[in-house]
């Protein structure tokens, strides 16, 4: 399976189950080039169906190996698939309903889905997909970049290109955030990437400080954070001896890079190892330990492979992740699927 095949298998799930959805972000080169997460907006009924039906993709060669909640209504998945060369490929759908940042609601999903547009790919056997209207894409993408306080040249170019598709509609959408409107329009019209990048921190403060967090949202976000602690999505592998760790490190990290948010190498003698391992696992980090740890740190080890073959170790890690994800989230255990 290629990443293109994996993408259209995922899109087929939405189409087959009649989930209303729209992709967010620069999809100009989809499905041939997908170099980041696949960001998706849906409504609450659609999200419930997605959580239930995504497990059926295993019959098509896509395995759920990760799932975690990173906002009140946002869930990050990792789907693993075997590529034609025998290696592992990954597709990372990041799906949400209303757009929240730090438990503050910024955008409603339903109006955006009402205005979505069809993007056809006539040269692709998979067909097309749904994407946001240019005005919604402009505002959503801008708010994401402001929230992360990060904007690359390619991302700024995407904002400008989307703005040019419907300038009036983009201005109207941006008017919902008066503290952003004039400044952002000026940066875009003047092609001032440096100015917008420098203003991101200030713009973020103006967006978030002008809105309060309702108590129910604060409670839901606290529950989410507690869940991340008690259901960590990181993984710790012990290499059998220092030489194995040095040999495995680049190859194993390359094989598993798409399955985790971060990667790290630790030595078993590292000061404060237990605390560091726990923090790494909560942050969805793949950790390779050069030696077997002692004390409480041993409790955080997920795999101590007996073999030396990197591909076998990578497959064992993905098998363990798949089992863990099913145990935590798959509704088949409750007779739903």
Each model region followed by its residue ranges:
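Structural motif
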Residues: 45, 96, 239-244, 266-270, ...
């Amino acid at each position: 399976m290629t990443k293109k095949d994996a993408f259209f298998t995922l899109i087929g799930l939405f189409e087959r189950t009649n989930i209303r959805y729209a992709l967010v972000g620069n999809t100009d080169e989809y499905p041939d080039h997908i170099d980041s997460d696949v960001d998706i907006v849906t409504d609450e009924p659609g999200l419930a169906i997605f959580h239930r039906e995504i497990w059926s993709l295993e019959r098509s060669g896509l395995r759920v190996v990760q799932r975690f909640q990173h906002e009140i209504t946002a869930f990050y998945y990792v789907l693993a698939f075997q590529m034609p060369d025998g290696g592992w490929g990954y597709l990372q759908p990041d799906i949400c309903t209303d757009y929240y940042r730090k438990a503050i609601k910024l955008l409603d999903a339903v109006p955006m889905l009402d205005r979505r547009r069809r993007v056809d790919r006539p040269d692709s056997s998979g067909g097309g997909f749904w994407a946001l209207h240019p005005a919604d894409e402009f505002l959503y993408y801008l708010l994401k970049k402001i929230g992360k306080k990060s904007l690359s040249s390619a991302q700024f170019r995407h904002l400008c290109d989307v703005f040019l598709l419907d300038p009036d509609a983009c201005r109207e959408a941006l008017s919902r955030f008066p503290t952003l409107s004039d400044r952002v329009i000026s940066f875009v019209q003047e092609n001032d990437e440096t100015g917008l990048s420098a203003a991101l921190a200030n713009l973020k403060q103006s967006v978030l400080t002008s809105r309060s967090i309702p108590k129910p949202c604060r409670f839901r976000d606290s529950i989410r954070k507690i869940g991340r602690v008690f259901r960590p999505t990181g993984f710790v592998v012990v290499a059998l001896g220092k030489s194995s760790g040095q040999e495995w490190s680049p190859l194993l990290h390359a094989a598993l890079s798409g399955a985790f948010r971060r990667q790290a190498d630790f030595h078993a003698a590292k000061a404060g190892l237990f605390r560091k391992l726990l923090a790494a696992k909560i942050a969805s980090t793949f950790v390779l330990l050069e030696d077997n740890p002692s004390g409480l740190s041993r409790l955080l080890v997920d795999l101590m492979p007996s073999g030396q073959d990197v591909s076998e170790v990578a497959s064992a890690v993905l098998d363990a992740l798949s089992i863990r994800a099913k145990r935590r989230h798959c509704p088949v255990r409750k007779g739903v699927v």
